Curated annotation (Swiss-Prot):
Protein name (record): D-3-phosphoglycerate dehydrogenase
Record's keyword terms, sorted: Acetylation, Amino-acid biosynthesis, Isopeptide bond, NAD, Oxidoreductase, Phosphoprotein, Serine biosynthesis, Ubl conjugation
Native source organism of the sequence: Macaca fascicularis (Crab-eating macaque)
Active site residues per record: R236, E265, H283
SUPFAM superfamilies: Formate/glycerate dehydrogenase catalytic domain-like, NAD(P)-binding Rossmann-fold domains, Serine metabolism enzymes domain
Catalytic activity line of the entry: (2R)-3-phosphoglycerate + NAD(+) = 3-phosphooxypyruvate + NADH + H(+); (R)-2-hydroxyglutarate + NAD(+) = 2-oxoglutarate + NADH + H(+); (S)-malate + NAD(+) = oxaloacetate + NADH + H(+)
Residues where Phosphothreonine is found: T78
Crosslink position(s): Glycyl lysine isopeptide (Lys-Gly) (interchain with G-Cter in SUMO2): K21
EC number of this enzyme: 1.1.1.95, 1.1.1.399, 1.1.1.37
Residues carrying Phosphoserine: S14
Cysteine pairings via disulfide bonds: none
């Protein structure tokens, strides 16, 4: 998937000026317009291939579907709650974020919230501003020796852990992805959730908002907590059930809460914000000069590197694409698309299971990034719903009635005895298998159904190929075929044959354009098909 034609980017939220400068220095045109309505945003995007947002702009399905040229949405921040990922993926629009940009700022705010909860600093400040001197009212608690439960041990969670350990806190946590060995390396003991609740003096959440994390803290879990537990949410509104939190505060089960995020922002229901034991901020987790600059810089660099084909970072909805930008993998992506296109032309809109098989040490983990490219080749001529690319390929292939499996073989798929890296694409249960490899940076076809080409056939983008199989070696065959090409006004550009396999030979002709029909070829060959990619 190439982004070289991405030329113009709209920045629709406030970002550090370095973002615009980096984009322009990278050769991109930049338009900055903020506070756009949905209709205004759609209008601006009619001439833009890229969009960069922070939190304010809502990139809905309506916006994505109406923006015909849109290729990439960049979120200068961690979450992508304001981008409709399903709609973007279906349309083949890449979504990126800056997962590292605001981690430190969010972690520091969390630590500040924990300290404010322990010593009631905001409440004491408000009291002083009212002219009061209430030393007894604001009795606090030390952090030393207390247990902090951290739910979500990614970048932010681990930064919080190391900082609060310096206050003498014991850190325990839970993360379904991070291994206990990894979390132990930064001082967090992982426990099951049901064991965490009764141990914690403080709980802080650092998970994405998913169906599995919505309402993670609820009436049931609050009931399992220590009486007087304190809760911090600087992650996403909705992870803590706001109704359950209010009830826990009112009953004293929860001694205090610090909230930077809400289910609705700004919150119209003020019951939580107005509670005397709640500290709240208007979503300030990433609101530092450093984070703003870092996020703006990172997303701009990601755009420029992507357009120049250097690298692809921060991908949210097509992680396999990241591998597609490595110098080693790029030509294999081209080969995979070519073999997918060949398979569709050969098998005629195949149904069932397509097998993608890799061989060779350097391709051991490449199946997940090569299979979308195979799908692009299979579907790009057939899909009536959308343009097929590496972003939406896996979604659209299911709707086309195809399953795609990937596997790695220590031995060559098809013809045995070759030690190089190979890629094979086959239709399960049917006599269709194509094998290719990369020579230098050129994808080449090595074999069809066990018939091996020596030398291999170059697969060049834009060069039509005509492939046909014959049973006998008739000296008059080649002049006859050239005559058929001439009758159709098509020139022969190259010609190669396979080694004889089971008494038959495959022939490959590079031709100046695809033939309007292969009917005239059928009396002379066992089978024939043509394609270009």
């Amino acid at each position: 998937m190439a982004f070289a034609n991405l030329r113009k980017v709209l920045i629709s939220d406030s970002l550090d000026p370095c973002c615009r400068k980096i984009l322009q220095d990278g050769g991109l045109q930049v338009v900055e317009k903020q506070n756009l309505s949905k209709e205004e945003l759609i209008a601006e995007l009619q001439d833009c291939e890229g969009l960069i947002v922070r939190s304010a702009t809502k990139v809905t399905a309506d916006v994505i579907n109406a923006a015909e040229k849109l290729q990439v949405v960049g979120r200068a921040g961690t979450g992508v709650d304001n981008v409709d990922l399903e709609a973007a993926t279906r349309k083949g629009v890449l979504v990126m974020n800056t997962p590292n940009g605001n981690s430190l700022s969010a972690a520091e705010l969390t630590c500040g919230m924990i300290m404010c909860l322990a010593r009631q600093i905001p409440q004491a400040t408000a009291s002083m501003k009212d002219g009061k001197w209430e030393r007894k009212k604001f009795m606090g608690t030390e952090l030393n020796g207390k247990t902090l439960g951290i739910l979500g041990l990614g970048r932010i969670g681990r930064e919080v852990a190391t900082r609060m350990q310096s206050f003498g806190m014991k850190t325990i946590g839970y993360d379904p992805i991070i291994s206990p060995e990894v979390s132990a390396s930064f001082g967090v003991q992982q426990l099951p959730l049901e064991e965490i609740w009764p141990l914690c003096d403080f709980i802080t959440v650092h998970t994405p908002l998913l169906p599995s994390t919505t309402g993670l803290l609820n009436d049931n879990t609050f009931a399992q907590c220590k009486k007087g537990v304190r809760v911090v949410n600087c992650a996403r509104g909705g992870i803590v059930d706001e109704g359950a939190l209010l009830r826990a505060l009112q009953s004293g089960q929860c001694a205090g809460a610090a909230l930077d995020v809400f289910t609705e922002e700004p919150p119209r229901d003020r019951a939580l914000v107005d509670h005397e034991n709640v500290i709240s901020c208007p979503h300030l987790g990433a609101s530092t000069k450093e984070a703003q600059s870092r996020c703006g810089e990172e997303i701009a660099v990601q755009f420029v590197d992507m357009v120049k084909g250097k690298s692809l970072a921060g991908v949210v909805n097509a992680q396999a694409l990241t591998s597609a930008f490595s110098p080693h993998t790029k030509p294999w992506i081209g080969l995979a698309e070519a073999l997918g296109t060949l398979m569709r032309a050969w098998a005629g809109s195949p149904k069932g299971t397509i097998q993608v098989i890799t061989q060779g040490t350097s391709l051991k983990n490449a199946g997940n990034c090569l299979s979308p490219a195979v799908i692009v080749g299979l579907l790009k001529e057939a899909s009536k719903q959308a343009d097929v690319n590496l972003v939406n390929a896996k979604l659209l292939v299911k709707e086309a009635g195809l399953d795609v499996t990937t596997s790695h073989s220590p031995a060559a798929p098809g013809e045995q005895g070759f030690g190089e890296c190979l890629l094979a694409v086959a239709l399960a249960g049917a006599p269709y298998q194509a094998v290719g490899l990369v020579q230098g940076t050129t994808p080449v076809l090595q074999g069809l159904n066990g018939a091996v080409f020596r030398p291999e056939v170059p697969l060049r983008r834009g060069l039509p190929l005509l492939l046909f199989r014959t049973q006998t070696s008739d000296p008059a065959m080649l002049p006859t075929m050239i005559g058929l090409l001439a009758e159709a006004g098509v020139r022969l550009l190259s010609y190669q044959t396979s080694l004889v396999s089971d008494g038959e030979t495959w022939h490959v002709m590079g031709i100046s354009s695809l033939l309007p029909s292969l009917e005239a070829w059928k009396p002379h060959v066992t089978e024939a098909f043509q394609f270009h990619f």
